[in-house]
């Protein structure tokens, strides 16, 4: 395609691509921290009721005389006796009786601060009857991510990738910092929602800006690099959270660096492909010549002119006369088909992913250890995914990742709750497959949608992912009906979604489409190739039958 030839002319993968890709993906280290930050800032330590203020523990015995026991013999977290309960005359005279009347924790709670000295749970007592508020905070963050995917995906197609990224960095820095100083839970949730919005824009535009500056043969490498940076961010979160256990300090530490990202983002070069798709040929020429100078291809850049670009990018200029809206995804049959299929893939991946990663305390092992393990499994999983993406194609990679993830989660549902090692061993490969699925779907979506609506399509796909992440915590409530019910649901959805991939075209080695006509011509070309393949196979089968005497 013409634009890919222009990229090769100005240096292909040169100094500019190396610098800009590095600077654009660097914030993703901390984006991973924000997405699962509440595993640590909202961790629930062991707790029990505080005895009445007038209770004289030294006179009335130990704390246990106020605390009923659960089935496992541990103190109840949300109930206390209305009066001290004395059992039969044991030698120490302090054996608690579990048959007395109980009441809620009207005087508050006592928390075990040995592992988590300070969380939003301990600061605002988000336990027992207020336990749902903890999950509400994460759901509101995901609502913000959903809104950000819709708003900033659309704005990026209208205003450009660079401008939206600059705005997103500033919004993340300000809202994240304000979250660290939130005086109450309501304000905390409001700023978390704003952080989610801006981080969604960063995620979308990071992928698109990088892919649009890269030649065809390097796009999969860039997508995999972005996935690895996100995985490294999970390692970073485990280490930082262990070193900084106070939630306000941790929140500030993962938010303040976005001020630096905001400052250097002014030096990014806007996508020349977006300029051409918007009909701004002068800005396209200026961007390409600037990249040529950075890549040491000054002479090749000087050969470019308005006439050369006008001849090479005639299709983009024609397309740029009108901007496509989000409604075009439903109005156009070809785009509608892509939108519905990709929406299912985005939803299933995010739904199952957050069902696993936001319940680290449910595995019965150290929360810091499981965070490291979940980050570590991404490395081999994404490497295998990269090899499959580049050798077999995007479609089989996407199908295999979702199918294997679903199977692992379904198997986990039949393992007894007390077998934490076995359950963790099944959850880890499932999480790795979902991480590989995220890696693939980002790249696959960007390659399927045409330039005129690519960012809007990415935004709508991410929107469906956020719907999955919002619904996921609600599904966990079905554990009250049957403990393994959430896992069965988390596993069934990606298995069903894996079948949808057969309805999508392969993009391996294909140029990025700029218009809907490009999509239709590519579909027609692949159909003709399949027909020719079938015609070729029929004589071969007939010949084989003749040889066998059939």
Curated annotation (Swiss-Prot):
Keyword Cytoplasm: no
One term of GO molecular function: organic anion transmembrane transporter activity
An individual GO BP term: renal tubular secretion
Catalytic activity: prostaglandin F2alpha(out) = prostaglandin F2alpha(in); prostaglandin E2(out) = prostaglandin E2(in)
Location relative to the cell: Cell membrane
Disulfide bonds: none
Primary location recorded for the protein, binned into one broad class: membrane
GO cellular component terms listed in the entry, alphabetical order: basolateral plasma membrane; plasma membrane
One matching Pfam family: Sugar_tr
Superkingdom of the organism of origin: Eukaryota
Family of this protein: Belongs to the major facilitator (TC 2.A.1) superfamily. Organic cation transporter (TC 2.A.1.19) family.
Protein name stated in the entry: Solute carrier family 22 member 6
Biological source species: Pongo abelii
Classification lineage: Eukaryota, Metazoa, Chordata, Craniata, Vertebrata
